[in-house]
Curated annotation (Swiss-Prot):
Monomer. Binds 2 Zn(2+) ions per subunit. It is an enzyme of class 3 (hydrolase). GO terms for molecular function: beta-lactamase activity; hydroxyacylglutathione hydrolase activity; zinc ion binding. InterPro entries: Beta-lactamase_class-B_CS, Clx_II_MBL, Glyoxalase_II_hydrolase, HAGH_C, Hydroxyacylglutathione_Hdrlase, Metallo-B-lactamas, RibonucZ/Hydroxyglut_hydro. PANTHER family: HYDROXYACYLGLUTATHIONE HYDROLASE, HYDROXYACYLGLUTATHIONE HYDROLASE GLOB. SMART domains: Lactamase_B. Pathway: Secondary metabolite metabolism; methylglyoxal degradation; (R)-lactate from methylglyoxal: step 2/2. This is Hydroxyacylglutathione hydrolase. The lineage of its organism: Bacteria, Bacillati, Cyanobacteriota, Cyanophyceae, Synechococcales. Its EC number is 3.1.2.6.
């Protein structure tokens, strides 16, 4: 599967069935976000002569942290950044963060956002343009909260939690790149097109996405602006509406 275009050193690496591991590179240093498995990431880094300096974890699910121990065997000094509320489920974290924390990585500020819903301690990482990076793109690593055309299942949270999280992410600058952790765009938009068959924004985007996937390319990253145009979950005006959409999507087998 071909990779999407790289922007500001942010690289998507497709692993397993549909996971996307993001690798953020500057010079010979790399940060990996939600490594599902170790081997393909080790290979990717080695082929480029890169050194792992940190791992960002959005939540505790095995297809997001499964590769971290293997990466640490190779780079034992790498920082593992994760939610303080998930210390028991991500025990190898070395830097525990909370909502509102700001850290500097690879010369850029990174802000931590509490987006609990998919899990009770899910966080996202936002790289704003800010004063020291005005030439760079705003980037969001959002794990399984906001998907391209969808949102994560509610394993530990409520529709109100997800509505709150999505509205918060949706308030980020419209040009912000949405780097989610799964390539679900086509299925999400097929479902959305069934719900809103007369919505040209959704149907037009679906046609583009279908062509992209047929060509063997990824559809990610998306953007906050694109999600406002065609993501029914982000467009939901209440937690009740979001809950109904989520329940319907959970049972959809299209």
């Amino acid at each position: 599967m071909a990779m999407a275009s790289t922007i500001d050193g942010i690289h998507p690496v497709a692993v397993l069935n549909d996971n996307i591991v993001w690798v953020w590179v500057r010079g010979n240093q790399a940060i990996v976000i939600d490594p599902a498995v170790a081997a393909p990431i080790l290979d990717w880094l080695d082929r480029r002569g890169l050194q792992l300096v940190a791992v960002l974890q959005t939540h505790h699910h095995s297809d997001h942290i499964g590769g971290t121990p293997g990466l640490l065997q190779r780079w034992s000094s790498a920082e593992v950044i994760a939610a303080a509320d998930d210390k028991e489920r991500i025990p190898f974290q070395t830097l525990s963060v909370r909502d509102g924390d700001e850290i500097e990585l690879l010369g850029r500020p990174v802000r931590v956002m509490d987006v609990r819903a998919h899990t009770r301690a899910h966080i996202a990482y936002w790289l704003p343009q800010g004063e020291i990076s005005t030439s760079l793109t705003s980037v969001l690593f959002c794990g399984d909260t906001l998907f391209s055309g969808g949102c994560g299942r509610l394993f530990e949270g409520t529709p109100a939690d997800m509505h709150r999280a999505l509205q918060r992410l949706g308030s980020l600058p419209p040009e912000t790149l949405v780097c989610c952790a799964h390539e679900y765009t086509e299925a999400n938009l097929r479902w959305a097109a069934q719900q809103e068959p007369d919505d040209a924004l959704i149907t037009n985007r679906l046609r583009v996405v279908e062509a992209t996937r047929r060509s063997g390319s990824l559809t990610l990253p998306s953007s906050i602006a694109e999600e406002w145009r065609s993501n029914l979950f982000l467009r939901a005006t209440s937690s009740e509406e979001l809950g109904r959409l989520r329940q319907h999507k959970d049972s959809w087998r299209g």
